[in-house]
C-alpha cells in the first residue's frame, strides 16, 4: 500500500481506466447556488463529500495513497476538466482534554496550506485550493504525472552520477528557495520527491514544514527515521535548515548508492548509528560525491555543511556552466505598503504570528528611514516579512487588484478555516505578475559591504548610547577594565571590528554587526553599559541568528581584543 506522501504522484498505469466516470464536464450553472455560496467561504457540507465519489465540484478518479492521518485521491474539477491531487485529512473534533492536540493538528494543516500556496517554484508542487467540511479538510494540489524517486530507485537501482546530479541540483534549487523564504521542509526523503513526465523534480508534502527564525529555535521531532538528523533523535532544539541539509545528504546517498546509509533490524540500533553518523559507502562512487555526502551527514550540526556550501561544492558544479538558480526574486526595500495584502495574510496566519501586521509596519518604517542597512537586511529575513514579499511577488504588487477589498469597517472575527480559505482564494485571484514595484532606487536586500555600512547614521552624534545600569556586570557581560571614557570604549570596539573584518552599523542603542567565517554569516549586536555601582564599563554581545560556531569566534575576537588592547 502506498503512503500518503505520494499525494501528487500517479504512474502511467494508474492513469489508465477510471476516466469514463468523469468524462463529461459539468456546466457551472449545474452546481447549486447554495454550494457556490458556501464554496466562496471554503465550507462544504458533509453531504457534498461522498467518500470515493466526489468533493464538492471535484470528482474522484481513483485513490493514490493512504497514511495514518490522511489519504490522497486523483480528482478532476468538473467545471474545468483539470486534474488535481486531493489530500483529505479528517478533522479532530473530540474536544475535552485533547483540545490542545487538536488545535496543534489543525494549525499544522493551516500552515501547510499557507506555505504551499505562497511558494512559487518550478520544482515545488503548489496548492491550488483549500476546502473544509465539519469533519474533513481538503487540500487541492496541482496534479503531477510521474513517479516517486523512491519507485525509480527500487525498480532501477542507483542512478548514474550525471542523472543524479541533475535531480539533486533541482532539489537544491527548491530547498534554497524555501530557506531564503524562512521555510524549512523537515520531511525530505525520496518518497517526497517526484520525477514528472518531463524528467524534472517536483518536491511535495509540506505537512511537517514550518517557518524558522534565526532567533527562535524549533523543538518538534519531524520526518522519517531513516532521514532524520541526530539532533532530532536526541530531542535537541534546532534552527531548521541544518536538519534539511542532513536529510539532503541521506537523499543523495540513496540516489547514488541505491539504499539508505543507516539501517538496522533493531530501532535502537538504527538510532545509535544515526546519532554517531556511522555509515559506509555500499557502492563505489566518485571522490567528489563521497566528500559531499560526508560533509552533509555529520552528527554535530555546527560541523555540518551549510546549504550554501553544498550548492557551491565541487560535485554539484562539476561539468556545469552556471550555478544553481534558486528562482528567488530580487527584493527591494518596501517603500509603500500594499494594505490589501496585509489583512488576508495576517488573519490567516494569526495562530502563529499574532503580531504580523505590527512587524510588517515596523519593517516598512525601517525601509523608509534608511536604505541598505544591516538592520533592514536582518528584518527582511524574518518569516512575516518573507510572507509579505511572497504574496507581493505572486500578485505583482498591483494596487489595482480588487480581489480583496477593505471598506474601512470592522469585520466580525473569522474562524481560522475560513480565513485560511479566503487567503488561498485571494492568492489565486489574479495571474502571477511581476515583482514589487514601489521602489525608490536600485537597492537589493542581499549582500552588504564594509564601505557602505561602517559610516552610517549616528557616527557624528554620539551614537550608540552607553547606557547606565545597576545590574549589568553582576550577572552578564564582558568587563572592560581601565577604559577612560565613552569615546575611548567606542574607539577600541571599532578597532576590533576593523581588525576582524566585522561589518557594523550604528544604531541608537547598539552596534548592529555582521561577521563571516568559512562562508557562514553571523549577525549580532554589541551594546555598551556603564555600571554606576561598580564604576566600570561592560559590553553585551547578543547573537541574532543561529550561526553559533561563528558567534563563538566573534565573542572570542571581541573579548580577547579588549583584554589585549594597547
Curated annotation (Swiss-Prot):
Membrane topology: Peripheral membrane protein
Protein kinase domain mapped to chain residues: 58-316
Disordered, as annotated region: 1-27
Principal localisation: cytoplasm
Keywords, sorted A to Z: ATP-binding, Cell membrane, Cytoplasm, Exocytosis, Kinase, Membrane, Nucleotide-binding, Serine/threonine-protein kinase, Transferase
Bias-annotated ranges (Acidic residues): 13-22
InterPro entries: Kinase-like_dom_sf, Prot_kinase_dom, Protein_kinase_ATP_BS, Ser/Thr_kinase_AS
EC nos: 2.7.11.1
Secretion signal, residue range per the UniProt entry: none
Broadest EC class assigned to this enzyme: transferase
GO molecular function: ATP binding; protein serine kinase activity; protein serine/threonine kinase activity
The reaction(s) this protein catalyses: L-seryl-[protein] + ATP = O-phospho-L-seryl-[protein] + ADP + H(+); L-threonyl-[protein] + ATP = O-phospho-L-threonyl-[protein] + ADP + H(+)
Entry binding sites for ATP: 64-72, 87
Domain of life: Eukaryota
Subcellular locations according to the entry: Cytoplasm; Cell membrane
One biological process term in Gene Ontology: microtubule cytoskeleton organization
Cellular component terms (Gene Ontology): cytoplasm; plasma membrane
Main function: Serine/threonine protein kinase involved in regulation of exocytosis.
Family to which this protein belongs: Belongs to the protein kinase superfamily. CAMK Ser/Thr protein kinase family. NIM1 subfamily.
Protein's UniProt name: Probable serine/threonine-protein kinase KIN1 homolog
Organism: Encephalitozoon cuniculi (strain GB-M1)
Amino acid at each position: 500500500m502506498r503512503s500518503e506522501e505520494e499525494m501528487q504522484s500517479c504512474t502511467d498505469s494508474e492513469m489508465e481506466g477510471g476516466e469514463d466516470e468523469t468524462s463529461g464536464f459539468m456546466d457551472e450553472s449545474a452546481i447549486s447556488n447554495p454550494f457556490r455560496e458556501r464554496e466562496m467561504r471554503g465550507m462544504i457540507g458533509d453531504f457534498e463529500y461522498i467518500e470515493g465519489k466526489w468533493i464538492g465540484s471535484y470528482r474522484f478518479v481513483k485513490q493514490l495513497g493512504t497514511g495514518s492521518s490522511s489519504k490522497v485521491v486523483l480528482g478532476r474539477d468538473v467545471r474545468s476538466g483539470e486534474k488535481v491531487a486531493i489530500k483529505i485529512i479528517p478533522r479532530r473534533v473530540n474536544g475535552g482534554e485533547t483540545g490542545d492536540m487538536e488545535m496543534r493538528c489543525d494549525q499544522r494543516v493551516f500552515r501547510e496550506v499557507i506555505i504551499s500556496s505562497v511558494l512559487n517554484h518550478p520544482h515545488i508542487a503548489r496548492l491550488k485550493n483549500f476546502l473544509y467540511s465539519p469533519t474533513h479538510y481538503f487540500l487541492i494540489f496541482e496534479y503531477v504525472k510521474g513517479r516517486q524517486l523512491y519507485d525509480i530507485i527500487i525498480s532501477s537501482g542507483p542512478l548514474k552520477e550525471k542523472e543524479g546530479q541533475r535531480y539533486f541540483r533541482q532539489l537544491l534549487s527548491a530547498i534554497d528557495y524555501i530557506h531564503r523564504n524562512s521555510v524549512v521542509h523537515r520531511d525530505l526523503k525520496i518518497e517526497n520527491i517526484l520525477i514528472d513526465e518531463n524528467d524534472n523534480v517536483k518536491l511535495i508534502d509540506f505537512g511537517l514544514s514550518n517557518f524558522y527564525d534565526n532567533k527562535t529555535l524549533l523543538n518538534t521531532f519531524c520526518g522519517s527515521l531513516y532521514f532524520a538528523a541526530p539532533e532530532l533523535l536526541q530531542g535537541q532544539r534546532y534552527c531548521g535548515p541544518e536538519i534539511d541539509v542532513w536529510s539532503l545528504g541521506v537523499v543523495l546517498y540513496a540516489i547514488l548508492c541505491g539504499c539508505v546509509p543507516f539501517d538496522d533490524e533493531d530501532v535502537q540500533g538504527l538510532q545509535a548509528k544515526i546519532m554517531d553518523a556511522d555509515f559506509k559507502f555500499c557502492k563505489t562512487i566518485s571522490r567528489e560525491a563521497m566528500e559531499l555526502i560526508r560533509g552533509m551527514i555529520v552528527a554535530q550540526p555546527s560541523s555540518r555543511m551549510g546549504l550554501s556550501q553544498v550548492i557551491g561544492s565541487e560535485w554539484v558544479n562539476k561539468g556545469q556552466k552556471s550555478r544553481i538558480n534558486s528562482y528567488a526574486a530580487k527584493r527591494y526595500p518596501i517603500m509603500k505598503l500594499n494594505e490589501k495584502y496585509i489583512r488576508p495574510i495576517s488573519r490567516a496566519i494569526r495562530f502563529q504570528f499574532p503580531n504580523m501586521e505590527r512587524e510588517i509596519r515596523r519593517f516598512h518604517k525601517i525601509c523608509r528611514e534608511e536604505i541598505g542597512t544591516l538592520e533592514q537586511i536582518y528584518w527582511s529575513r524574518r518569516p512575516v516579512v518573507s510572507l509579505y514579499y511572497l504574496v507581493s511577488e505572486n500578485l505583482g504588487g498591483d494596487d489595482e487588484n480588487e480581489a480583496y477589498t477593505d471598506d474601512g469597517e470592522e469585520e466580525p472575527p473569522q474562524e481560522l478555516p475560513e480565513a485560511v480559505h479566503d487567503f488561498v482564494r485571494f492568492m489565486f485571484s489574479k495571474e502571477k505578475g511581476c515583482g514589487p514595484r514601489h521602489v525608490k532606487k536600485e537597492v537589493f536586500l542581499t549582500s552588504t559591504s564594509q564601505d557602505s555600512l561602517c559610516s552610517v547614521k549616528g557616527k557624528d552624534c554620539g551614537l550608540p548610547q552607553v547606557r547606565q545600569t545597576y545590574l549589568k556586570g553582576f550577572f552578564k557581560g564582558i568587563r572592560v577594565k581601565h577604559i577612560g571614557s565613552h569615546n575611548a570604549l567606542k574607539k577600541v570596539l571599532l578597532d576590533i571590528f576593523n581588525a576582524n573584518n566585522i561589518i557594523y552599523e550604528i544604531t541608537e542603542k547598539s552596534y548592529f554587526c555582521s561577521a563571516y567565517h568559512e562562508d557562514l554569516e553571523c549577525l549580532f549586536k554589541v551594546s555598551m553599559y556603564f555600571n554606576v555601582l561598580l564604576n566600570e564599563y561592560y559590553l553585551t554581545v547578543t547573537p541574532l541568528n543561529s550561526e553559533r560556531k561563528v558567534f563563538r569566534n566573534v565573542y572570542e575576537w571581541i573579548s580577547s581584543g579588549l583584554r589585549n588592547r594597547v
